[in-house]
Amino acid sequence: MAYDWLKGVADEYDVIVIGSGLGGLTAANVLAKAGHRVLVLEHHYQFGGLATWFTRRGGHIFDISLHGFPSGMIKSCRKYWTREISDAIVPLKDVRFVNPQMDVRTTFTRDDYTRVLVEQFGVERTKVEAFYDHLRAMNFYDNNPETTGEMFERFFPGRDDVKRLLMEPIAYANGSSLADPAITFGIVFSNFMGAGVYTYRGGSDDLVEKMAAELRRNGVELRKKVLVERILVEERNGRKVAAGIVAKGGRVVRAKAVLSNANLKNTILRLAGEESFPADYVTAAKAVRINTSSCQVYLGIRKGESIPYIGDLVFTSANPRFSSTELTDLNTTSRTFSVYYPDTRPGGDRYTVVVSLNARYEDWARLSDEEYEREKQRLIDESIAALERYIPGVGAKIDWREAATPRTVERYTTHFGGTSFGTKFEGLKVSMDLPEKLPGLYHAGSVGIIMSGWLGTINYGVIVANKVDKALHAEKRPAPAPTPA
């Protein structure tokens, strides 16, 4: 008889969180500290969403997410998690860009990026400062239709090399392209330009384990290996409302509010179902474009071997010019090396390299099993060959090679289209409007590009948790007494 992963779970909670990505976990923590009874359900065998890890024979630990985020993570983790977590967030010292148009090393701070643009690229300092000021002034509510590509051309006409330096790291960070609204670049880039790129010392395993411990201290019930099949929808006073979840196997757990940390389209079209929403909202949800996916190659260096320091994040490409299309092509030459040195996990002596490539789900979904295995092997071989340029002879030091594709992302996250970056910009409004269309249901996943990445999803989790808290308190307030005639 299969083990019951819901054994001991109560029949009702104040809030059920579906999914345990950073947005879901943070929302759960905020709500628990506000005094609500919270249940988190995760279908995977460990928590963290895409901020996760896996182990392999030979003592290897591989982190999944590209390990770089803005300094704002320090403040957010201190405020919504613990000082112990925030104190482990440290700067990455060396970000590199190597392609036919440039060979740049930078700390990725505003001052250093300005130095690179002025000294290496010959851009006038006044133009650089004007560009930064424009980005800082951007507002979500301005509804500016300008695209990122159009904005670049306005500030740096004809300078494809400058556009590449600006766009490439953000494309890896959140899947955005030159055709996306300029605000999707501006907000994220400005966040990075504050104080550079940071990472979590200790690895994703240490981070998520500390988060899980904090959640339990605050009374959150955490359960993994539980697949939510659908959101329980009932009719009350002539209107449909979210009333809980139905897990695989049929177990019903009720709740005053359900917060989905799943993909937005999964939440609306699969979990709640089209029939639960007004027709115009379903049309808007279907029109939301899914963002791109990713491939990764995991390279483990044999115990006892070492590799030289080549930088923390190395953005590389053999493509002559920057192209959002080439960046996601099945045969792209554009890849990022995330290099994990022993100080990533203090006390250890191991080196690993995670190679990240942006990708399109449809390119991988159509492959036969034989073609799929062949393409994965090509990814591995080409990634090692590219790494040899920076570390000659590294292939002989590697004793674990493995590749993941958009199909892997889909398998472990159930995301629509295997997306690793949520939705395009229009998804943010659909996500924010969810509780108006189906009371009791909220969404705090990766949406709109600006709510992507570790910092974006944590902050969105806080925003949505505060909405849930406000709604729950409003429910508890007694109805006002009728006014005497």
Where on the chain are the PLM-derived regions?
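Active-site-proximal substrate-binding core of FAD-dependent oxidoreductases
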Residues: 233, 469-485
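C-terminal segments that line or cap access tunnels to active or ligand-binding sites in enzymes
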Residues: 302-404
